[in-house]
A protein has these predicted regions:
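General nucleic-acid-binding
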Residues: 1-18, 107
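Intrinsically disordered, low-complexity basic tails/linkers immediately adjacent to helix-turn-helix/homeobox/MYB/SANT
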Residues: 2-3, 78, 82-107
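C-terminal helical "lid" subdomain and adjoining coupling/linker elements of P-loop NTPases
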Residues: 8, 32-35, 63
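Short, Lys/Arg-enriched anionic-surface-contact patches
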Residues: 19-43
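Short, amphipathic alpha-helical "recognition" segments used to contact nucleic acids or chromatin
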Residues: 40-56
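Short alpha-helical "recognition helix" segments of helix-turn-helix
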Residues: 59-68
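Residues in the recognition helix of alpha-helical DNA-binding motifs
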Residues: 64, 74-75
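RNase H-like, Mg2+-dependent phosphodiesterase core
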Residues: 69, 73
Length: 107
């Protein structure tokens, strides 16, 4: 029973990460799981937030996004490289803060 609750909690946290990233990049949440490239940066940032803020493993994050663990690794690396741009870095930092606060808020 506890295992089911833990999985449910991760799903709601993943939903939070996806909603925050989608809103920040002006795309629909549904586009994040699609194969279309227009939501690519938002999808990469959502994957990055799942790994960094939620501390999910590569495989677990991959399952949540319907992607292979290698894709998650690549997405996180791309976001880390893009953080060289100060504007993008501030955006990601802000998103990390939002997700941390929302994830730790009482239900």
């Amino acid at each position: 029973m506890a295992e089911l609750t833990a999985k449910k909690d991760h799903r709601s946290e993943i939903g939070l990460v996806q909603a925050v990233a989608a809103h920040a990049f002006g795309v629909a949440v549904g586009e994040l799981n699609g194969r279309n490239g227009t939501a690519g940066r938002a999808r990469q940032v959502a994957m990055y937030l799942a790994r960094v803020v939620l501390k999910l493993g590569l495989r677990e994050t991959g399952r949540a996004f319907g992607r292979d663990h290698k894709t998650i690794f690549h997405a996180c690396r791309r976001v880390e490289e893009a953080r060289e741009d100060p504007t993008f870095d501030r955006t990601v930092e802000w998103l990390e803060t939002l997700v941390r606060r929302a994830a730790s808020a009482p239900a």
